[in-house]
Amino acid sequence: MSMCMSLLYSCTTDKGLDKLAPAYQREQEVLDGMRTKLEAHQGYWRMAYYPDEHRSYGGYNIYVRFVKGRVEAITELDMNKDSSSYDLVSIDMPTLTFDTRNEVLHHFSTATEYFRNARGGDFELLIRGNQADTILLEGRKTHNQIRLEPINVEPSQEIASIQKVHQTLQGKGIQPMTIGSLSGVQIALYSTYRTMEFILPATGEDGKATSIKEAFHYTTNGIRFYEPVSIGGVRISALKLSEDASSLLDESNGLVFKLTTPILDFYRNKYAVKLAEGSASLQFYGSLRSVNKEMVRQYGEQLSTTMYLGSNTASDVEASLEGNDTSLATMLWHDLNDTKGKSVGRSLSYEMDFAAHGDNAQEINFFAIDGNESTFWYYYDRSVKPWINLFRRYSPYKVEKSTSDGVDTYRLTSTKDSRYWFDIKAL
């Protein structure tokens, strides 16, 4: 954008200032022009939306259509749709505001018991200018850049492709690789909160590795970073999923990010863990006893000794066990019992990502995400968070399979401390 980008004032000479219309009039002309542009497009606009000033939740595609002062919004998360009013006003500068409640547009700006300060979503978007047909916006609170691009297809078509890419990348590891002048770059993919982390090899006298994290949003054929990542003299803006879905490709730089498929698929399966002698190490079932002692003291309830890992099911959703952003999600959860070990009819769950560790399909990383609102995690957080931290601290885990009487059992042993292990079985 040039120095003459101002939406309210054109570049002019001092002699021409007296010919300018009053500021409020120029302001209104800008707002009216933007309203006309938004509503003149008969289809939807694709909005690449990043909540939170640190973009720690990644980016999301939201599809919006503007008609007669109302906006209809559809989210890529679950294709939910909602309609509400919108307005164009001047708050310091021209602003697109979603001024009445909309379940899609206010999803990340809604405070809950767990997300007490919401998740940093913006619903007042500063109008920064245009780039061809694209409208450039900026979140008032986060200052995140947001692009509004017109599309001429139904959102359902794009969303189907976006969700397919997302599902393909769930649980995938990425093999270490050379990027530009740096070799041995390790990469972690956080598929749920849409972030990629590049761990750079140790350099200098301190010998410490450094890392770069960058948020991205899914596209119809891959991912696009919020802003280009610079590594080893190379700038990476977007990655395309290869036709055989075995790699992510940076076609502009000729880079191939080879994907690793883990031996266990937590995104399509549900596994059970019996936290007791013989099926888990003392380090785990002993820690559960300590957590439960505190749970009983604080709440008169305790976690069941059976733990579940992986994806919840439709029947779990019916029992109010669901994710924060989508009904189905990957998580770690327990049934809640009373002091006598009888179920109280509720669960307690924490969302997690489970991904192959680098190029090793036999090792699984546990990435903690957030406690689930649906199971009132916020109420128990102080007592139970150490339990989640334990699994995260000793990740990744090496997977070893054994079969007895036709039943497969997988032993997961920490690669950091072999005293920490537990067995899981698919349900």
Where are these regions (language model features)?
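N-terminal glycine/threonine-rich, aromatic-flanked beta-hairpin/loop signature
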Residues: 52-93, 183-221, 290-371
